Amino acid sequence: MADKGSKPRKEEVVSREYTINLHKRLHGCTFKKKAPKAIKEIRKFAQKAMGTTDVRVDVKLNKHIWSRGIRSVPRRIRVRIARKRNDDEDAKEELYSLVTVAEIPEGGLKGLGTQVIDEEE
């Protein structure tokens, strides 16, 4: 049983790296809707993984998805999702998730699992 003094798991501030398979999420999608649908799927993935409804997508990640056009979205993407505290006093949510693109190692994406990242801040 959990300790009474410990916080719930979804309340912690944490960063993790994930590999998202966009190919299976966009299969059968109309060509002209692929890139917008990919952004929506990344948001949905981050909501489920981090348990926050407020998900913010980084500009570099958006540019990476759109880099090959609206039709040719990358099959897989490595992202870093950070759950952070909301400093705004009048914010609806206490926590938000920031999704950024992670660097891909030269060995490729095979064998990489979910990794917890230590905060540099």
From Swiss-Prot:
Q: Provide any one GO MF term from the record.
A: structural constituent of ribosome
Q: Which domain of life is it from?
A: Eukaryota
In terms of PROSITE patterns, this protein maps to: RIBOSOMAL_L31E (PS01144)
Disulfide bond entries: none
Its cellular-component GO annotations read: cytosolic large ribosomal subunit
Q: Name one GO biological process term.
A: cytoplasmic translation
Q: Is Ribonucleoprotein a UniProt keyword of this protein?
A: yes
**What name does UniProt use for this protein?**
Large ribosomal subunit protein eL31
Record's keyword terms, sorted? Ribonucleoprotein, Ribosomal protein
Organism taxonomic ancestry? Eukaryota, Viridiplantae, Streptophyta, Embryophyta, Tracheophyta
Please give the organism.
Perilla frutescens (Beefsteak mint)
Read off the InterPro entries from this record.
Answer: Ribosomal_eL31, Ribosomal_eL31_CS, Ribosomal_eL31_dom_sf
Which family does the UniProt entry place this protein in? Belongs to the eukaryotic ribosomal protein eL31 family.
